[in-house]
From Swiss-Prot:
Subunit structure as annotated in this protein's UniProt entry: Composed of two chains; the small (or glutamine) chain promotes the hydrolysis of glutamine to ammonia, which is used by the large (or ammonia) chain to synthesize carbamoyl phosphate. Tetramer of heterodimers (alpha,beta)4.
InterPro entries according to UniProt: ATP-grasp, ATP_grasp_subdomain_1, CarbamoylP_synth_lsu, CarbamoylP_synth_lsu_oligo, CarbamoylP_synth_lsu_oligo_sf, CbamoylP_synth_lsu-like_ATP-bd, CbamoylP_synth_lsu_CPSase_dom, MGS-like_dom
Binding site for Mg(2+) 4: E836, N838
Stretch list, region Allosteric domain: 934-1047
Domain MGS-like: 937-1047
Segments forming domain ATP-grasp: 133-327, 676-865
Name of the featured protein: Carbamoyl phosphate synthase arginine-specific large chain
Binding site for ATP 2: R712, A750, E756, G781, V782, H783, S784, Q824, E836
Amino acid sequence: MPKRTDIQSVLVIGSGPIVIGQAAEFDYAGAQACLALREEGIQVILVNNNPATVMTDEACADVVYFEPLTVASVKNIIERERPDGLLATLGGQTGLNLAMKLEEAGILEAYNVELLGTPMESIKKGEDREAFRQLMHELHEPVPESEIVHSVAEAVDFANTVGYPIIVRPAYTLGGAGGGIAESEEALIRIVKGGLELSPIQQCLIEKSIAGFKEIEYEVMRDSNDTCITVCNMENIDPVGVHTGDSIVVAPSQTLTDQEYQMLRSASLKIIRTLGIVGGCNIQFALDPDSKQYYLIEVNPRVSRSSALASKATGYPIARMAAKLSLGYGLHELKNPVTEDTYASFEPSLDYVVVKFPRWPFDKLVHVNRELGTQMKATGEVMAIERNLEAGLQKAVRSLEIKTHGLSLPSLSQWEDSELWVIVKKADDRRFFAILELLRRGVTIEAIHEQTKIDRFFLTSFAKLMTLEKEIAGQSLDDITSDELSTYKKYGFSDEWLASSWGVGLADVRHTRKALGVVPSYKMVDTCAAEFEAKTPYYYSSWTGENDLLLPEKAKERVLIIGSGPIRIGQGIEFDYCSVHGAKSLRARNFEAIIINNNPETVSTDYETADRLYFEPLAVEDVLNVIEVENVDHVIVQLGGQTAIGLTKGLEEAGVSILGTTQDVIDQLEDRERFYEFMRSVEVPHIPGKTAETKEELLKAAQSIGYPILLRPSYVIGGQGMFIASNQEELAAFCEDKNHSVTFPILVDAYYPGVEFEVDVLTDGSDIFIPGMFEHVEKAGVHSGDSMAVTPPPTLEAKWKQQAINYTRQIAKGMAYKGLFNIQFVLYDEELYVIEVNPRASRTVPIFSKATSLPLITYTIDVLFGKTIAELGLSAGYRKESPYYTVKAPVFSYQKLAGLDPLLEAEMKSTGELIAISKDLPSAFRKAFAWGEEQTPALFRKKGSVFCQVDRAYDTEWQPLLRQLKEKGYSVVTEEAMSFSEWLASEDAICLVSVPAPGQKTGKQNREEALKQRVTVVSDLATFEKMIECLEVKDGEPFLLPDVVMN
């Protein structure tokens, strides 16, 4: 069917800020979809309040609204723009749920907006557990014995009939939110109660557990002609019981017989046809490895996390094709852009193995429950491509950046067998490494299979790696042969691991390996197992077979951008935005842009972003291999976050020069003693501090500086390991806490709780350009990534802005650096101090780019290649402030991470961010707080009761807020009047204000309990003050940046 001509404009709903279960994959999908629609001459109107996304660029959409993802907000946009169609299946669960509410409210019908792609009826059949189960019964497709419940009592009755364990799956939630496996009635009551509260339709599916079965996924496409294909099938190494987002996944499936593969493929095609889905769909099965009986677990009637993985694993652009199908095209009419010869109806085939490995946040969030179940906890993931499973696993582990260059976590080697078995049976994020450790100690494959139900095929691969490890340990670099080294490399052992095993330097292994002729070949991802010639410049390394890499004759300078790896707390999608724009700017300036990265969720790993893409670990060995095979002229590290910065030393030692910076400059800013020395040399005040090499020195330093103090490790992201101590007892307790590994040397800073603000700076080595300043709402001591912030600064006096500009200029002139950097200041006691200088693009660069409509990354590329600030047409100094306010607000994933205290501290906890823009500040804050349909605080919806636990140290700030709260009609409850548990059980409970004394964590249990009951928790009075100021502000009109920027 040809493209429809009656659709001229389409509203696309984005997925909003990153939360666990909904990350960068929807930026990739959304950007692809928007570009696909624009290729067809469709006007694209986008609503998405995530500023760090590529899809919110002017190049992706004709009109961009950074507005709340609520029914009221989207209704206003529809009223203003009058789109012909709405595309909601590319915005994750957020987009689907919002589309459903718009339809139920009659808004789509009232404004004659057609839901494109998958019909609403099909969405409901896939998402509504009761409708889905009924349909599967009609199709005779087996589902686990189950019951739909709307109350806890119904759940208990079902469990009493079928027995425990029971799996709970709430309807219309994200990443398994609210779900879990209940081993007892007590656990069932707790999980179902939470699940019903999280489900927008107050519905849960509870089913007899089939934990231990194989979990298999199919990614399927269908067009309106009923043509269907399977794009990719994937197998979870972890059996059913661990959320697929927390499972190690391989593609294609490794343990299915052809009969099993075809059986599940046929079922997938039958299901997508019956549901009537147009576009992409993810279908998950459980397969009994003994009886071959299968059960359908669930269907995602939208582009999903697995879609992004399948797209990168195969090269088949699922989101792009889904967008075209929504306009009426058939699969047979769309060319596959990878081959440019075959059509989209041609099923991909793979001649390699793909391994996806989750990246969890437990290295930062040490007190969180690490146990894995049906509720997702990973913040991101990595993908590795190889010719065998063993090498794929090794590559994936090395891509995680978890301080290991092999297959062991050093801490586990000290554990007793009994301790290892606990995490193997219960499954937490260390399970894979615990299994390997047990295999090292001689535990049999059969014993591990019995306890985990992981297929013996996978365990045999694990055991093979352990056998090779032992063999390598008995070798030496001097005696190694070419064949032996080739074998070790073929199975994925890194140069760094070999160097460590043989007690030699990394450069020694590299030199010997190259002398023996053991070098990687590069293979192409082509969707067709080399059956057709591919045009895509998308490569992975292997140590077997011939080289597919055919480089064009070198007519341009080649520039390598090192990406930022997996999404994690402290290093998110913002850095991918920077990498993507870096590549685009290089190509526009007649350079060949090359990207190396390993995150399957991102736009940077789309094969169309750069001239060539390498899907590799971000380690010195792998980056050097690419530099050598490409004969790279320049390397950029400042766009890839701390990951890329961390590679500078190893690259420099290998003779690679870095654009704009050196390791010496990085050390000058990251090493705190050198940093203080540098600050003194440029005559800029800094926070007083000392470096401690031992615990004794730490206690002495704290005593001499004076409490409160802030512990600050060097070379970390997201404030990892930071801690504020108000006295010696707190500091001693922190040092003794087994959950924290205090690594020395460590910096001891004085803690100044003043007004914090930050600047992003572009420098050509002489002049500076500051696009804006962000003033933080919360005082210094709350990590900048977890602070709300406003630009332009609403309370900062002109003299302090000028002082900051002067200090910035002095720092830029003194540090032999070109490009983007970030400075954080604190104003305390009428004195301005520098907290830190980050020699790279920061997480606020995309926000300033969006809020000012300035191409900051393009400017950065120009500066790196010799242009001055003046030659860019920019006025040196501080850009004129905008006549509107942009509020940046952090977004947390507390519901997914049991045990995480929502207290704002020095260590970052947020997983994403959003922006809200308005001409007046209260309206901007209102949009920031009430940013999503399900996320609007209860405080904004009704006038209930607020429970207050505020330490007396804050009486001066607290009493005026208390009066305002009462004047606005809210009731205030204290512990003297009512117990917390009694208040929480009341229908009026809407908000807990829990602010312990500085440095204290009292009230943690109450904060956690309030979160479980979906009650708003506020732990900082400055945040609460902003909430109160905008409580009675009406929802503002949709705000378009060009309206103001052009005037």
